[in-house]
Amino acid sequence: MIDHTTTFVLTSTILAAMTTLFLLWVRRLEAGSRRLGYAVVAASGVMCVTYLLMAAGVLTVSTTGRDESVARFLGYSIAWGAVASVIGLISGAERRYTLALLGGILLSLWATVGSWILGGTAGTVISLAIVAGVGVMGATLYGPLARQAQTVSSERTLLFSRLRNLTVLVFVGLLATGMLSAQNLAFTDAFVGQTLATYLDIVWLAGFGGLVLRSTDALADATDDRPATAAVNSSSSTDGATTGSVQSAD
């Protein structure tokens, strides 16, 4: 059986190769589209470093069943932040909905850590926060973000739908792996749990990168839309301030 350290180093090597490939791919994009492309590079690069930290045993905490590295969840927080940012920009939704999406994701992730550390009733209560986080994530993805995505170009709508489906499938898979792990329901041992989580991470990052970087038309349209959106928001703020001044004068 392969030990965890070897698995983590091997995974980090795979992610390093993916990050390099994504970086070269991004450099071939139009200048305006590279910002979204660099989010892909950041997500993959952060998880590459995360797996190296896990291999070194950095930031480990004692959980029910075995020691776990909090570094994985710090990496997840940054990488999923990059994913949420891209989804929000592609959909054209307001920033508050992107933050709501990220908030739901982070709540579920860190509640999972809490459920591992705290056993008994406290662990059960924290598990409810996992469900709440998934609920917020799903409601945001299938609610305001989906509605706004219907108002943008067909290329962006298609990319949003694919990213949404990938996010839901991978995220639910990661949470299911965490719940079935030795720290919770103990349906899987440590080796199986780590292997499943590692596989899902590679699928998630490869899928995210491939979907985003191949959708050049969607990236270009989203980039062109940003200045227009900013101008509209600025105009609305100016109009509101002018109206307020006139009313005060009256």
For the regions a language model picked out, list residue spans one by one.
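Hydrophobic transmembrane alpha-helical segments in integral membrane proteins
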Residues: 1-18
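Alpha-helical transmembrane segments in multipass membrane proteins, preferentially the mid-helix core
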Residues: 18-24, 133-157, 173-181
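Hydrophobic alpha-helical transmembrane segments of multi-pass membrane proteins
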Residues: 14-17, 36-57, 168-182
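Haloarchaeal acidic low-complexity proteome signature biased toward cell-envelope/secretome components but also
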Residues: 1-5, 32-35, 142-162, 216-250
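Extracellular/periplasmic helix-loop-helix junctions in multi-pass membrane proteins
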Residues: 176-201
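Membrane-interface helix-boundary motifs at transmembrane edges
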Residues: 25-39, 89-97, 149-159
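Helix-loop junctions on the outward
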Residues: 31-33, 49-72
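Membrane-proximal helix-loop-helix units in multi-pass membrane proteins
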Residues: 80-82, 86-152
